[in-house]
């Protein structure tokens, strides 16, 4: 089993090329395999929520791009399901959350849970990267995260498929639950 990236062959995310190459190598190897093309993890954004609370703003560069993220647990359950059922193996799955959201909607969800307004502030990609670097992230990581947000604005992290919830036999974890866990 290989965990890849949602819509890897068509993705403009900087990390797509290595996933596409790995998928090609697996196909050429003749070894039986299953590919789980995971969408974004909701925790990718949830881990920044304590800082958003501290600074009274959630910042990003995703504009109003829809993000079809799912919780890490959802992806883990899908992998376990496929590993335990030979009938599900040998395929490629495009996995994403049932509930898409914008970063403004994430900020609104956070605001509702803490009882105070935490706005989403959208900024240009370079400014967002600079803000992340200023907060202590290494420049390469800050640039990568800003690039991912900018690509989200173009729809790269959006998907309407429900293969993930079909595999796990339930709806994917709601955004509100991941937010609650992050601010615990």
Predicted regions, residues:
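Catalytic nucleophile serine of serine hydrolases
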Residues: 4-5, 171
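Oxidoreductase cofactor-interface core, primarily capturing Rossmann-like NAD(P)-dependent enzymes
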Residues: 5-119, 123-126, 130-135, 140-141, ...
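C-terminal accessory subdomains/tails of enzymes that are appended
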Residues: 117, 166-167
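Amphipathic terminal alpha-helices
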Residues: 163, 171-184
């Amino acid at each position: 089993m290989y965990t890849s990236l949602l819509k890897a062959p068509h993705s403009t995310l900087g990390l797509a090329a290595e996933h596409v190459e790995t998928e090609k190598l697996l196909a050429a190897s003749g070894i039986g395999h299953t590919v789980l093309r995971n969408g974004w993890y909701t925790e990718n954004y949830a881990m920044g929520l304590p800082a958003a609370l501290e600074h009274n703003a959630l910042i990003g560069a995703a504009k109003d791009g829809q993000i079809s993220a799912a919780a890490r647990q959802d992806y883990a359950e899908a992998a376990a399901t496929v590993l335990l059922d030979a009938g599900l193996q040998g395929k490629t799955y495009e996995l994403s959350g049932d509930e898409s959201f914008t970063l403004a909607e994430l900020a609104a969800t956070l605001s509702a849970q803490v009882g105070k307004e935490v706005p989403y502030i959208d900024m240009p990609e370079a400014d967002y990267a600079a803000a992340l670097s200023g907060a202590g992230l290494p420049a390469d990581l800050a640039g990568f995260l800003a690039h991912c947000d900018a690509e989200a604005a173009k729809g790269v992290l959006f998907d309407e498929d429900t293969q993930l919830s079909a595999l796990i036999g339930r709806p994917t974890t709601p955004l509100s639950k991941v937010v609650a866990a992050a601010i615990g």
